[in-house]
């Protein structure tokens, strides 16, 4: 992902304030609510029968945290996203058979959640930088599919 120095600073400064536990669970939960077909990959998570059940599901929250911890690793390695996410790409492609479009959807949901949490601090410039990052991460995760 090519970010200017200003964009990298904006992304890392905001990310330092992110509560990974809270934002991760909310982002994954919203993905499952807004795009219900993605739930098929999480059948082992138990009750996903309603938005309240999804948002309160401890397995959704735990996996959301795990996802954002991986995203944090990506932010430390913006110049090598494909390498950083190679094993996860292989897992999601070969073993889990996740539709790579879901990575793009989750990235966009994450941007919405960040905007909600940070309000005015999430300026259009910060959003533009995050859109680049989530697109880069989604492409890296989809790499094994090509």
UniProtKB/Swiss-Prot annotation:
Whichever gene encodes this chain, its name is: HBB
Q: Which residues carry this modification: S-nitrosocysteine?
A: 93
- What quaternary arrangement does the UniProt entry report? Heterotetramer of two alpha chains and two beta chains.
Task: Please give the tissue specificity annotation from the record for this chain.
Answer: Red blood cells.
Q: What is the lineage of its organism?
A: Eukaryota, Metazoa, Chordata, Craniata, Vertebrata
Gene Ontology annotations of biological process type: hydrogen peroxide catabolic process
Sites where Phosphothreonine occurs are at 12
The organism's superkingdom is given as Eukaryota
Q: Does the keyword NADP apply?
A: no
The answer to whether UniProt assigns keyword Aminoacyl-tRNA synthetase to this entry is: no
Per UniProt, the keywords (alphabetical) are: Acetylation, Heme, Iron, Metal-binding, Oxygen transport, Phosphoprotein, S-nitrosylation, Transport
| Protein name as catalogued | Hemoglobin subunit beta
Which InterPro entries does this chain map to?
A: Globin (IPR000971), Globin-like_sf (IPR009050), Globin/Proto (IPR012292), Hemoglobin_b (IPR002337), Hemoglobin_oxygen_transport (IPR050056)
Q: Which residues carry this modification: Phosphoserine?
A: 44
Similarity field: Belongs to the globin family.
Where does this protein come from, organism-wise? Nasua nasua (Ring-tailed coati)
Task: Locate the residues binding heme b.
Answer: 63, 92
Pfam families xref list: Globin
């Amino acid at each position: 992902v090519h970010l200017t120095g200003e964009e990298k600073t904006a992304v890392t400064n905001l990310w330092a304030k992110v509560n990974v536990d809270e934002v991760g669970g909310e982002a994954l939960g919203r993905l499952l609510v807004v795009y219900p077909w993605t739930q098929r990959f999480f059948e082992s998570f138990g009750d996903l029968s309603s938005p309240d059940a999804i948002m309160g599901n401890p397995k959704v929250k735990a996996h959301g945290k795990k996802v954002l911890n991986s995203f944090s690793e990506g932010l430390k390695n913006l110049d090598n996203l494909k390498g950083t996410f190679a094993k996860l790409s292989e897992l999601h492609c070969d073993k889990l058979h996740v539709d790579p479009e879901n990575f793009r959807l989750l990235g966009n949901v994450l941007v919405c959640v960040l905007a909600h949490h940070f309000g005015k601090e999430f300026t259009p410039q910060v959003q533009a930088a995050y859109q680049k990052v989530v697109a880069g991460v989604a492409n890296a995760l989809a790499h094994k599919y090509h």
